[in-house]
Structures are given as structure tokens and as C-alpha cells.
Swiss-Prot record:
Involved in pre-mRNA splicing as component of the spliceosome. Intron-binding spliceosomal protein required to link pre-mRNA splicing and snoRNP (small nucleolar ribonucleoprotein) biogenesis. Plays a key role in position-dependent assembly of intron-encoded box C/D small snoRNP, splicing being required for snoRNP assembly. May act by helping the folding of the snoRNA sequence. Binds to intron of pre-mRNAs in a sequence-independent manner, contacting the region between snoRNA and the branchpoint of introns (40 nucleotides upstream of the branchpoint) during the late stages of splicing. Its main location: nucleus. The lineage of its organism: Eukaryota, Metazoa, Chordata, Craniata, Vertebrata. It is found in: Nucleus; Nucleus, Nucleoplasm. This is RNA helicase aquarius. Keywords: Acetylation, ATP-binding, Helicase, Hydrolase, mRNA processing, mRNA splicing, Nucleotide-binding, Nucleus, RNA-binding, Spliceosome.
């Protein structure tokens, strides 16, 4: 197997290169945004740039990046575009810029939407250019650029401007391009289309000739483009050299065809045109397919196109076709061929009279039709309306190979999509893992096209939706597997031994050499299948490794996935491995197969089962694991061995590799998706079309649902009637009681429900009444029934005063339908979610709600807030891992809940015993839940009924107040409640108290009745299943857990009515969809009533490690984001309470009307300034340190030493002023920088109690969903903006801080970036040097924005700050030390021991020696040992590559007068204890 060539990484230009470029000089003259006086527009500039910069460099990405980054499209090209100045260079320049925007994944159409006037003219010229001759004005490379532009247009149908142009190309009139017989056949199939067709012809006759000609050109555009492509394809030779321009053109064209076929609006009309052109037949017979190297990607794309042309869907209705309907279509085709053969071709009688199953294979079709002449084959095809009729006495122009393939490919039996899927192995093999077209490397630049499905806005059917996600999920996990295999195998250093075998010169934690491998079982296939039901094997390894690694291997659990690898190295012993060269050649990798652990075998060869029992201790170091192999893969390998004489793969394995369990769940998720595709997915009717991206996007909104609920109990949502009125601005609120004293929460609100259907009323007065009625809310205060006399009986209440948009979100979430809540940072998303859950729980006690989040952290936050509301904890259940991080003492996991139920049962039975004793009833009523039930029925109820009969109303007179207390039968039981129980003020009040007491007693027995099942079910597993299926009302899990455990949940009969998803914009499309189907449908219908998604699509999307899947396939698009793009109505929360208003301004431009809650203006912490710092936020410019800005010791492992040291110096400065270290977090945009900063902190101040460590040092991506008071942010890059150009990352970075944000960056680079302008224009309005107030301690009373009374110091650069902090620390130590001496008169012994450092200092003679000691306690600025972080696998690098070395000389002195570090601290200098003294280095001691 040929190893893939290592692709080159595109190096982004540096700032100095950008400034030196000709383009930049032109930009500064004509269009740069920061230039005030610009030169007038000159068309020649565009011509020159296109010819000299773009064409001359063969469309080099670097040049196009520069142009696009300089805002060439926005500020020059489109701003000045008009038909008068349009030219080839102008058109091509715009197309290049748009394509580059798509490649960079930044919004491309905004500028066109702002100035749409000339777009139709521009688009028509693009169409004209795309059809131009390849040897004419437009070269093939230029036409490939145009094809890519058109592909982007067809994939942007959600943009009105684009859609209006594209619709003219793809609609029913495009069938003009069909041959007449085929057109008649299609119109006959769908009769209603003939009516439209006649109407189109009639309208065409009314058009003037010029407009008609223009319309005809647009309608025939795609037909002509196909013909043009076929001519280019035919010009590719079989073996002679071919230009790559031709190959790329063909690949891009097929990509365009796939995208047109995979979208229903375009497919509906285009599929017939494509079929009539026989494009697939031409392609499969072309020379390009036969060229192995050049045509490999083309062939893969062609297979995708073939799949979509035959997709199981009715093009006109959009309905998915069933297996039976597909079979019927196939039979109809064969029988029509047989009828034509019988009627007109006597030589085909045998074929015509055979049954379908005999003749519908490729072999039999070739046998019958192969002997026929070309003319006869043409006639057969014309009878089927596949080709135009052949005129008499004329020979066909098509060759025989084409005609035969046309008939055979059309009529051969196809394997169904679901069968193909079921026969597919789930584990990747070496052929897929290292195929660059399917699993590209990390260096994917976005230039070429790939044989990958795309996730856009719409899907053909649910099967198509699941299949695309299945393939992408499989390939994304394959990419990660490839990285793991390459890492583990290269660490093992496989070399060829002297005798030709394998010898391993290294070792790997995650891989072991295999000692023996045996297949032990191949089970019989199921009926109708040709692969075994089960294949098991035994793998023996020798665990001669450290104990903790041995424990990891022995800890492999059932269902863990491992990989079996065969290597046959050709390199001799001792050869060095070079990571920059292709991996496969170096290690000699031959095979990779996946397997799933069943268990480890004991001494007797039996599988050791997972369970609570301790594992047996096995002797020796040899361990054998029983594994399941993939039956489909095994079948394919065995067939290959038997039929083709290939070697038996299963006798060659010599390495087994395991993976981290957290990253190794791909097989379970793939199995879940495959199971979904094999079952009838019943998505609720009201969601089906929205999920596929069709129909009215607002159809699932509660206002359009037929089962809208008029009256809702808002429980404790409102704090007062004023809060309620403020929550519905523009509504007329009518309260059913007039007494203000009674207008207290909780409230029931009756909303006016509009029925969707109704007669139109013409009377204006009636309309006014309607509007008035529609805005009237009827509010009914009600009293929660008394729950008992104990303080804990009182319900917990919400204390948050929700805003009116939050109330709208809560209202929408309580109503049936789809609710989408967009929650910007700090707007209370979690509080809204919790209130919705609580309100559903109280309004619909019989319903069950499923909570799904992206992370365990979010789930824990939800649970902690749910606990604070009035929800009975016995109804809460948490599935999956992560509950150990919950900051509550309660365990909500399955077994935690089982233990809670058992403990609660004992508590309640004790209460029953106490009640029994108080009533003087003999016997043992509290023995079981059952006996307690009988006790309640015969002893408690009888007494209560007797009591009620005594105290109830007798006629018109009320009973005496004292009677309520006198006759009460449970006085003794309630003796431990706060006394007196009865107030004696009124009969109604005392009667309510009595009923409350009885409710308390009744609740005991109700709970015992529920817990009775735990007496009958004996095992913990059965009890936990019962809890899940019957008891729990609110069930929470992560999306990953849902995907892994769907099969088990469905098998248990798990049911739920509502789903609430938090962090919905961070969840993968497929992981959002699976939770909808965790239950089997009832009578063919889903019982799902509500789907609430809460997220923020302006923050970071799901994490996809491979750039190709992220960008090309758009796999990072969450379902939430797609719904927003499609136009599903959202509730946008619009008031934040996290950050200062000034900090909020840095990101609120990204949201609709995001304002601040009142407390952000009023609370002292928000109005007070940040002590010691002049500004609450500041952008600090960091220039190169020692001539180095960003460095990249490994690909994409970016570091910036200057910024890292500066950030740490500011952190230390803040801590020295008195800021708590845990209130400061340090964020950066790259992993490399994160590791470097951590190293510097460890070195400088990590173990110093005076300073300590910040709360977190992590990346912006990892910190999403968290916050802290003060954020120090390092942007790292100095050559190119990098991935901060994604505005979503910028929003996350800017919105993590509550009180202070300090950003360290190369300002000249970031201020020019168009996407970042709204934030950076505010940041650059303030000085770019750090302004500090060293004499102002924390906390301060100075108001934010006030001029300080202390002196402000301006820090110009990092060395200055480092030295300043160093001196400040030294001053603080000396002052503290002096203060201690005056205050503490220590005993002589302690002075001797505790002031070792001071004694040393006094003995030293020179200032220089004194500084040496201090520098031992605080590493001096010449100490650079932590300068540059490099990962463990770093290859040898020179100082110039890494930016610094570990020698003291690498960083010169930062100041003449002080020892010059980038100065910071490793231990406090007031070493008053022996322990502190020992922390100094050895030399000092």
C-alpha cells in the first residue's frame, strides 16, 4: 500500500511580509479601512492585481489571503462594481475573494446583501463565463474557480439574494433541456406538472424575444455545463501526462453535481436532467477513472454521485421510498425493457420471457445484450426514451461500450442502502485510515475537494440525514485512531531483526506486542445474512511493565475497543524514526483491525466478569484477553483469502493497541446510529420537516401548535404582581381578585389562544375587540395547600426576578412544541432552564422530562440549582459519570438513588412506628411498606374520616373554633412540631392546618407505596431499572451517554415526554438528534411533547479535531445553529448580569439588543475600579522579545514567550497588590501557549504562598461556560490572526471576565482584521501600554472611570514590567521582614533556626552577594530555564526554531541595576520557618 505523500502546510504571511507586499501598499493607497484619504477608484488597479498577483502566482492561497484580509472585496471590489466597469479580471477577483471567505469559514455574502443592486448582472456574467470555451478567454483553472463559486451559491439557498438567482437556473422550465420523448414520459408520470408546463409555454409566448432568449439560456445552463464537462473529460488521455487543471476541474464539477443532487429543492428538477445526460455512464467509461493515481479522488466522488442519483426518494413529493417501492421501481424498469425486447427484437425473446430474478444481474444483462450491434442497442435505448430515436439508414454516433453500459447500469439489481450499511464493518482498516481523500491530514488547507459528505441546511430524508452523520462520525474517529496508532507504534520502534522477523526497540504505554493470537469461535450466520453472528478470538500479551501500566491493561473492561496491528518493518535495528516522513513506510504497517474486549481470562480459561466481586489475582505476567472481532470484516477478509488467495490477516497480528476510554466510544455511537437506521425512526410529525430543513420553520413554535395550553400555573416564577405586570409589557393584566392583599404569588395565567383557522372578519370594530382580547391576560392568584406543621414542609421558592424575555422563554418552554432560547453570556440560561423544568414538573406531574447537556459540568450546575427549587429529590435521577463532581452531599446516580430510596424507606417506617405508638395501636405496622399501607387504610383513615364528620359544617352555622383542635386525633404524633399547631384565630385557618397535618401523614404512606417495589426487587440493578422507568420524573444525562446507551434504554422501555437541552450549540448534530429517539413509539407515534433547546450559536461550536471535517464537511455545525440559520423562531435573552457594562460592550454587538441588568450598574463591585490598574479593560501591545514573536516548535503548537512572561508578570503584580489568586484566570488561544504559561508559573510563583497560582490556566475553548472576576488573555499570534478570526472564539474570549479583562497581543496584526473590528475598535481607543497604579492596594474605593489620586505608571514593554514586579516583590519582602522583627520577639532557639535567611544576608559582604540570596528565593531575570515549552516528543531544534534555549545567556539582562529576570518568584522571602528555609536551592544552604 503506497504511503500518502506528506502535504505541505500553508504558512501564513507575517506582519512584516504583509507590510512589504505590493498588495498592502496598494491597499494603503486605495481601500484600507484605517486610511482616511484614499485615492479614487481605478479599474486598472484591479486588472494589475489580478494579472500580476493572482494569475501570475497560479492563484496562490497566500496572495489571495492577503487580498481578502485587507478587505479588498468589501472596500474596493463590490463597493465600486457596476455593469459599466465589469470585466474578466473584475469577475474573477470577486469570485476568488468569495471562495477565500468560504475557505476561511467567515461570512461571505454580507457585503452583497448590503448592496444587492448589481448582483443579478454579476451572476449572469458568471454563468456566461462558466460556459466559455476552455481554450478561449477563461482558462480551465479560472473555470474551476467559477465552478467553486457556483457551488457556494447553490449551497447558500438560505440567502434570499442568492436563492432568487439560483431559482432561475433550477426549476421546472429547465426541463427544456430534456429530449422530447423523455419530457413526455416525465410529464405523464406526474400529471399535475403538465398543467404547469402548458402555463410556462403560454407565459414564454408573451415575453419579448430578448427576455425569452435570456430565460432559455438560464434554463439550459446546467444541461450545457454538463455537455461542456463531458468534452473536457473525454480530452483526458489514458496514459499520457495530463494537466492537473483538467483533473481538478473534473473533480470540482462532480462535487457540484453531488451538492445539487443532495438538496431537495435543486434535486427535484435537476435529477431528471442529470439522468437524461447519462453523465455517470460517460464518467465510468472515461480514461480518468482508469488512471489510478490521478483518478483516485475522481472515482470516489463518482461513487458518491452514483449513490445520490439512485437515492431512495421520490423527487417530486420528497417522501422516502420504502424497500418495497424501490423493488417495484426496479421491476417496472426490467419489465418495460422486456416488453420493448418482446415487441421489437425477436433475438431477445429468451430475455423477454425470463423471470426478473434471472436477468437482472450485470452478468446476465451483458450475456443477453452483449452480442447485439450498436444500432440495435441504440434502438432499444430509444424505445425506453433514454436516447433520441435513430433515423432510418443512419448509424449511431455512440460507441457500443457506452450503449451497453447505459442499458446494464440502468437495469441491474442494486443492493439496498440499508443492506449496504449492515454489511459495512464499523472499525476502520488501514485502507481507510491512511486514505487522504477520505481522512485528510491535519494540514488540510481547504483548497482541494474531498470525497466527504457535507452537512448543510437540508437533507433528503431521515436516512440521508443519519447516513451523512454516520459517515462523518466514523471518519472523524478514524482520524483520531490514526493519530493514536502512529504515536503508539512509532514509540515501540519496530525494526527488522537479523532473521527477518520483528524486534521492538522501544515501548508504548498504550500498546503491547502480541505473544499469541487465536480465533476461537465463528458462530453461524442468521437466516438471510452471509456474515457470522459472532467471531471471538484470544489475544495473549506479556505484561512485563510497571505496576500502574499493568493495572491499566488488566483494567480493560467489557466493550472497550482495541486495535490489532500487523507490522513488517524493513528498516534495520537502530534506525531513527522521523515524524516528518510517511509513517507506513518507516514502520512497515500492513494491517489494522478493530476488536472489542469481552474480558480477561482466568487461570482456567474462563472470562472474568465485570462486577462488584474482587478480581482474582493471576500469577505471572502473561495475560489473555477474549475479544469480539467485527463479523462483517471477518467475512470480507475470509472471502478475499479464499477467492483471491490473499494471506490470512488473522494469523499475522503482532501488536495490540488500546485507547483512552474517554475518547473510545465511537463504535457504540456508530452502532446506535446504525440501529436507528434499521428501525422506523418515529420523529414527531411536528418536528419531521424542520429537522430535514423544509417547510415553515416556525411551524413547531407553540403559537402554531394545535394543542396550545390556555391556562398555565407559573408556580413561583413571579415574585409579586408588579413583577408579573412588568413581565408582559403591552398586555392588559386582569386579576380575578381585587383585594391587593390577596394578589400574591403563585399565579395561574390564562392566555388568549388563537385558533389557527377561522373566518376572516371584515368589521373593524370586531378586529379591534380581537386585538384587545389577544392582549388580555387573566391572572388568578392561588394558595398552595398547607403541607404540614414542620418547617421543612414549607416549599422552596424561586428568588430570581426574571426579565420579560426570560419569562417569554419560560412560557414557551411550558407550552408544547419546539422552543429555542439564545442565551448570550451571563443572561441566566441555566436559571431559565431550571425554572422551565420546575414549572413542567408542577403543571404536568404525570410527565417525565429528559435533560441533556454537552458536559458534566453543565449538568452539575443544573442539578445544584434544581435542588434549590421545590422539586422532590426522589424524582431526580442522573445517568452516566460525573456526578462525583456535584457540589452537593447527595448522590443522584442510579445506585445513589437506590440507596436513598432504601434509607428513606427506613426513615418513613420509623415515622409509621411513631404514629402507631401515638395512636396506641398494637402490632407491628412498620414492618414493611405493605403492612404500613394496611395500617393507613384501617387505622389512620378511619380516625380522619370520623374527625371530619365531627368538625365539618353543620347546616348554616360554623362549628366552634376550639372543636378543630379538641377532636384532632394526631396531637401526640405532632407533639414535636412547633407549638401551638392550631392558632385558634378562625375556623378556616385551623381547618387548613388540620388538613395540612393529614397531608403530611398521607404523603408518608404515598411514598411508602412507591417504595414498595424496592422490597419486591432484590438486586440493585433491578431496583435501579425500576427507578429509571417508573419513579424518576426528571432524568439527566450527557449527550454522549445518550448516544452510547440508547439500545439499553429502549430495551428497558424508557419513556419521556419532554426534552430540555443545555449548551445545545456545543453538541454535535447527531448527538442532538439521538436523544429524541431514546424511546420506542406508541402506536406508531412519538409521545414527545416539548423540545427545549438553550444555547448560544455566537459562541464556540462542537469540537472537531480534523480541519477537513470541521470546514469542508461543516461537521462543526450544531443542530441548534442549523435551526437558527433555517429561520426557526428563537427567544433571545437580552439582559446580562455577569460583567461590567463596559466589558459587555466588547461583545454585545454580536447579539440583538443585549443590555445589562440593573444590578450591573448598582452593585459596588461593578462600580468600583480595579485596584492598581487604571482601566477595567485594556489591550496591551507586545512586540517581539529578543527578535522573536510567535514560535512553532511543532505544527500548530504556537507559543509566544514575550506575551507569556508579560501575562505572568501582571498576574504576580495583581497578587502582590492583594488580589485573591483564585479570582484571576489566565486564558490563551493555543495549547502551546497554555503549557508555556503553566511552566513559567511553576517556575516563578506557583509554590509561593504570597502569590500562588491563578484559578485556571487554560485555553479559551476549554473555558467556555465558565467565568472569573479577572481574565488575563494572551492572543499569541504575530504572523497571522489564526483561529481567533472566527468571531465565535472572540465572543467567548471577551465574555469570560466579570470585572477586568487585560489582553496581550500584537496590535498591528489584530486591528486590521475585518471580523474583529467591532471589538478591537473599542480596545484600541484606549492606550496600548499597560497603565498601573502601584501604590493603590486591593480593594480600592476609587470609582470606575475616576482619575486616581495616586501616581499612574506606564509600562512600555515586558522586561520593564518584569523588573518592576521583581523590585516590588523585594521591597515587600524587606518591609514585611522589618515589620516582623519589630513585632516578634522570638525565643533564642527560634531566632537561630527561623531566621536563617536573614542571618545569611547579614554575613554577606557585598550587595551583589545579597542579591544572589534574594534571587534564590525569587528566580532572577537571567534565569530562563522555563523559557520555551516543548512537548515530550519534540525533535531536536535549534534556538532559532524554538525562540529560546535553556542557557542563561539566551535572555540578556533586562536592566543594569537589578539581577535581570523576567522576574518573578518561587518562594516567599520571609523565611521564618525551617520549612521555608529548605525551599531555597542547595547552593544557598
Amino acid at each position: 500500500m503506497a504511503a500518502p505523500a506528506q502535504p505541505k502546510k500553508i504558512v501564513a504571511p507575517t506582519v512584516s511580509q504583509i507590510n512589504a507586499e505590493f498588495v498592502t501598499q496598494l491597499a494603503c493607497k486605495y481601500w484600507a479601512p484605517h486610511i482616511k484619504k484614499k485615492s479614487p477608484f481605478d479599474i486598472k488597479v484591479i486588472e494589475d492585481i489580478y494579472e500580476k498577483e493572482i494569475v501570475k502566482s497560479r492563484f496562490a492561497i497566500r496572495k489571495i489571503m492577503l487580498l481578502e484580509f485587507s478587505q479588498y472585496l468589501e472596500n474596493y471590489l463590490w463597493m465600486n462594481y457596476s455593469p459599466e466597469v465589469s470585466s474578466k479580471a473584475y469577475l474573477m477577483s470577486i469570485c476568488c475573494m468569495v471562495n477565500e471567505k468560504f475557505r476561511e469559514n467567515v461570512p461571505a455574502w454580507e457585503i452583497f446583501k448590503k448592496k444587492p443592486d448589481h448582483f443579478p448582472f454579476f451572476f449572469k456574467h458568471i454563468l456566461k463565463a462558466a460556459l466559455a470555451e476552455t481554450d478561449g478567454e477563461f482558462s480551465l483553472h479560472e473555470q474551476t474557480v467559477l465552478l467553486l463559486f457556483l457551488d457556494h451559491c447553490f449551497n447558500s439557498l438560505e440567502v434570499d439574494l442568492i436563492r432568487s438567482q439560483v431559482q432561475q437556473l433550477i426549476s421546472l422550465p429547465m426541463w427544456m433541456g430534456l429530449q422530447l420523448a423523455r419530457l413526455e414520459l416525465e410529464l405523464k408520470k406526474t400529471p399535475k406538472l403538465r398543467k404547469f408546463w402548458n402555463l410556462i409555454k403560454k407565459n414564454d409566448e408573451k415575453m419579448d424575444p430578448e427576455a425569452r432568449e435570456q430565460a432559455y439560456q438560464e434554463r439550459r445552463f446546467l444541461s450545457q455545463l454538463i455537455q461542456k464537462f463531458i468534452s473536457v473529460l473525454k480530452s483526458v488521455p489514458l496514459s499520457e501526462p495530463v494537466t492537473m487543471d483538467k483533473v481538478h476541474y473534473c473533480e470540482r464539477f462532480i462535487e457540484l453535481m453531488i451538492d445539487l443532487e443532495a438538496l431537495l429543492p435543486t434535486r427535484r428538477w435537476f435529477n431528471t436532467i442529470l439522468d437524461d445526460s447519462h453523465l455517470l455512464v460517460h464518467c465510468y467509461l472515461s480514461n480518468l477513472v482508469r488512471r489510478e493515481e490521478d483518478g483516485h479522488l475522481f472515482s470516489q466522488l463518482l461513487d458518491m454521485l452514483k449513490f445520490y442519483t439512485g437515492f431512495e426518494i421520490n423527487d417530486q413529493t420528497g417522501n422516502a421510498l420504502t424497500e418495497n417501492e424501490m423493488t417495484t421501481i426496479h421491476y417496472d424498469r426490467i419489465t418495460s425493457l422486456q416488453r420493448a425486447a418482446f415487441a421489437h427484437f425477436p433475438e431477445l425473446y429468451d430475455f423477454a420471457l425470463s423471470n426478473v430474478a434471472e436477468v437482472d444481474t450485470r452478468e446476465s444483462l451483458v450475456k443477453f445484450f452483449g452480442p447485439l450491434s450498436s444500432n440495435t442497442l441504440h434502438q432499444v435505448a430509444s424505445y425506453l426514451c433514454l436516447l433520441p430515436t435513430l433515423p432510418k439508414n443512419e448509424d449511431t454516433t455512440f460507441d457500443k461500450e457506452f450503449l451497453l453500459e447505459l442499458l446494464v447500469s440502468r437495469h441491474e439489481r442494486r443492493i439496498s442502502q440499508i443492506q449496504q450499511l449492515n454489511q459495512m464493518p464499523l472499525y476502520p482498516t488501514e485502507k481507510i485510515i491512511w486514505d487522504e481523500n477520505i481522512v485528510p491530514t491535519e494540514y488540510y488547507s481547504g483548497e482541494g475537494c474531498l470525497a466527504l459528505p457535507k452537512l448543510n441546511l437540508q437533507f433528503l430524508t431521515l436516512h440521508d440525514y443519519l447516513l451523512r452523520n454516520f459517515n462523518l462520525f466514523r471518519l472523524e474517529s478514524t482520524y483520531e485512531i490514526r493519530q493514536d496508532i502512529e504515536d503508539s507504534v512509532s514509540r515501540m520502534k519496530p525494526w527488522q531483526s537479523e532473521y527477518g522477523g520483528v524486534v521492538f526497540g522501544g515501548w508504548a504505554r498504550m500498546a503491547q506486542p502480541i505473544v499469541a493470537f487465536t480465533v476461537v469461535e465463528v458462530a453461524k450466520p442468521n437466516i438471510g445474512e452471509n456474515w457470522p453472528t459472532r467471531v471471538r478470538a484470544d489475544v495473549t500479551i506479556n505484561l512485563n511493565v510497571r505496576d500502574h501500566i499493568k493495572d491499566e491493561w488488566e483494567g480493560l473492561r467489557k466493550h472497550d475497543v482495541c486495535f490489532l496491528i500487523t507490522v513488517r518493518p524493513t528498516k534495520p535495528y537502530g534506525t531513527k524514526f522521523d515524524r516528518r516522513r510517511p509513517f507506513i513506510e518507516q514502520v512497515g504497517l500492513v494491517y489494522v483491525r478493530g476488536c472489542e474486549i469481552q474480558g480477561m481470562l482466568d487461570d482456567k480459561g474462563r472470562v472474568i466478569e465485570d462486577g462488584p466481586e474482587p478480581r482474582p489475582n493471576l500469577r505471572g505476567e502473561s495475560r489473555t484477553f477474549r475479544v469480539f472481532l467485527d463479523p462483517n470484516q471477518y467475512q470480507q477478509d475470509m472471502t478475499n483469502t479464499i477467492q483471491n488467495g490473499a494471506e490470512d490477516v488473522y494469523e499475522t497480528f503482532n501488536i495490540i493497541m488500546r485507547r483512552k476510554p474517554k475518547e473510545n466510544n465511537f463504535k457504540a455511537v456508530l452502532e446506535t446510529i446504525r440501529n436507528l437506521m434499521n428501525t422506523d425512526c418515529v420523529v414527531p410529525d411536528w418536528l419531521h420537516d424542520i429537522i430535514l430543513g423544509y417547510g415553515d420553520p416556525s411551524s413547531a413554535h407553540y403559537s402554531k401548535m394545535p394543542n396550545q395550553i390556555a391556562t398555565l400555573d407559573f408556580n413561583d416564577t413571579f415574585l409579586s404582581i408588579e413583577h408579573l405586570k412588568a413581565s408582559f409589557p403591552g398586555h392588559n393584566v386582569k386579576v380575578t381578585v381585587e383585594d391587593p392583599a390577596l394578589q400574591i404569588p403563585p399565579f395561574r395565567i390564562t392566555f388568549p389562544v388563537r385558533s389557527g383557522k377561522g373566518k376572516k372578519r371584515k368589521d373593524a370594530d370586531v378586529e379591534d375587540e380581537d386585538t384587545e382580547e389577544a392582549k388580555t391576560l387573566i391572572v388568578e392568584p392561588h394558595v398552595i395547600p398547607n403541607r404540614g406543621p414542620y418547617p421543612y414542609n414549607q416549599p422552596k421558592r424561586n428568588t430570581i426576578q426574571f426579565t420579560h424575555t426570560q419569562i417569554e422563554a419560560i412560557r414557551a418552554g411550558m407550552q408544547p412544541g419546539l422552543t429555542m432560547v439564545v442565551g448570550p453570556p451571563g443572561t441566566g440560561k441555566t436559571d431559565v432552564a431550571v425554572q422551565i423544568i420546575s414549572n413542567i414538573y408542577h403543571n404536568f406531574p404525570e410527565q417525565r422530562t429528559l435533560i441533556v447537556t454537552h458536559s458534566n459540568q453543565a449538568l452539575n450546575q443544573l442539578f445544584e440549582k434544581i435542588m434549590a427549587l421545590d422539586i422532590d429529590e426522589r424524582h431526580l435521577l442522573r445517568l452516566g459519570h460525573g456526578e462525583e463532581e456535584l457540589e452537593t452531599e447527595k448522590d443522584f446516580s442510579r445506585y445513589g438513588r437506590v440507596n436513598y430510596v432504601l434509607a428513606r424507606r427506613i426513615e418513613l417506617l420509623e415515622e409509621v412506628k411513631r404514629l402507631q405508638k401515638s395512636l396506641g395501636v398494637p402490632g407491628d405496622a412498620s414492618y414493611t411498606c405493605e403492612t404500613a399501607g394496611y395500617f393507613f387504610l384501617y387505622q389512620v383513615m378511619s380516625r380522619w374520616e370520623e374527625y371530619i364528620s365531627k368538625v365539618k359544617n353543620k347546616g348554616s352555622t360554623l362549628p366552634d373554633v376550639t372543636e378543630v383542635s379538641t377532636f384532632f386525633p394526631f396531637h401526640e404524633y405532632f407533639a414535636n412540631a412547633p407549638q401551638p399547631i392550631f392558632k385558634g384565630r378562625s375556623y378556616e385557618e385551623d381547618m387548613e392546618i388540620a388538613e395540612g397535618c393529614f397531608r403530611h401523614i398521607k404523603k408518608i404512606f404515598t411514598q411508602l407505596e412507591e417504595f414498595r417495589a424496592s422490597e419486591l426487587l432484590r438486586s440493585g440493578l433491578d431496583r435501579s431499572k425500576y427507578l429509571l422507568v417508573k419513579e424518576a420524573k426528571i432524568i439527566a444525562m450527557t449527550c454522549t451517554h445518550a448516544a452510547l446507551k440508547r439500545h439499553d434504554l429502549v430495551k428497558l422501555g424508557f419513556k419521556y415526554d419532554n426534552i430540555l437541552m443545555e449548551e445545545a450549540a456545543q453538541i454535535l448534530e447527531i448527538e442532538t438528534f439521538i436523544p429524541l429517539l431514546l424511546q420506542n413509539p406508541q402506536d406508531g407515534f412519538s409521545r414527545l411533547k416539548r423540545w427545549i433547546m438553550i444555547g448560544d450559536h455566537h459562541q464556540l461550536p462542537p469540537v472537531i479535531k480534523n480541519m477537513a471535517f470541521q470546514k469542508y464537511s461543516n461537521m462543526e455545525q450544531s443542530l441548534f445553529t442549523r435551526f437558527v440559520r433555517v429561520g426557526v423562531p428563537t427567544v433571545d435573552l437580552d439582559a446580562q448580569g455577569r460583567a461590567r457594562a463596559s466589558l459587555c460592550n466588547l461583545y454585545n454587538w454580536r447579539y440583538k439588543n443585549l443590555g445589562n441588568l440593573p444590578h450591573v450598574q448598582l452593585l459596588p463591585e461593578f462600580s468600583t475600579a480595579n485596584a492598581g490598574l487604571l482601566y477595567d479593560f485594556q489591550l496591551i501591545n507586545v512586540e517581539d522579545f529578543q527578535g522573536v514573536g510567535e514560535s512553532e516548535p511543532n505544527p500548530y503548537f504556537y507559543q509566544n514567550l514575550g506575551e507569556a512572561e508579560y501575562v505572568v508578570a501582571l498576574f504576580m503584580y495583581m497578587c502582590l497588590l492583594g488580589y485573591p489568586a483564585d479570582k484571576i484566570s489566565i486564558l490563551t488561544t493555543y495549547n502551546g501557549q497554555k503549557h508555556l504559561i503553566r511552566d513559567i508559573i511553576n517556575r516563578r510563583c506557583g509554590n509561593n504562598p504570597l502569590i500562588g497560582r491563578p484559578n485556571k490556566v487554560t485555553t479559551v475553548d476549554r473555558f467556555q461556560g465558565q467565568q472569573n472576576d479577572y481574565i488575563l488573555l494572551s492572543l499569541v499570534r504575530t504572523r497571522a490572526v489564526g483561529h481567533l478570526r472566527d468571531v465565535r472564539r472572540l465572543v467567548v474570549a471577551m465574555s469570560r471576565a466579570r470585572l477586568g479583562l487585560y489582553i496581550f497581543a500584537r496590535v498591528s496584526l489584530f486591528q486590521n482584521c475585518f471580523e474583529l473590528t467591532p471589538a478591537f475598535s473599542q480596545l484600541t481607543a484606549r492606550p496600548l501600554h499597560l497603565h498601573i497604579i502601584p501604590t493603590e492596594p486591593f480593594p480600592t474605593t476609587r470609582k470606575n472611570g475616576e482619575r486616581p489620586s495616586h501616581e499612574v505608571q506606564i509600562i512600555k514593554n515586558m522586561p520593564q514590567m518584569a523588573n518592576f514586579v521583581y523590585n516590588m516583590y523585594m521591597h515587600l519582602i524587606q518591609t514585611t521582614h522589618h515589620y516582623h522583627q519589630t513585632l516578634l520577639q522570638l525565643p533564642p532557639a527560634m531566632v537561630e533556626e527561623g531566621e536563617e535567611v536573614q542571618n545569611q544576608e547579614t554575613e554577606l559582604e557585598t550587595e551583589e552577594e545579597a542579591m544572589t540570596v534574594q534571587a534564590d528565593i525569587i528566580p532572577s531575570p537571567t534565569d530562563t530555564s522555563c523559557r520555551q515549552e516543548t512537548p515530550a516528543f519534540q525533535t531536536d531544534t535549534t534556538p532559532s526554531e524554538t525562540g529560546a534555549t535553556s542557557t542563561p545567556e539566551a535572555i540578556p539582562a533586562l536592566s543594569e541595576t537589578t539581577p535581570t529576570v523576567v522576574g518573578a518568584v518561587s518562594a516567599p522571602a520571609e523565611a521564618n520557618t525551617p520549612q521555608d528555609a529548605t525551599s531555597a536551592p542547595e547552593e544557598t544552604k
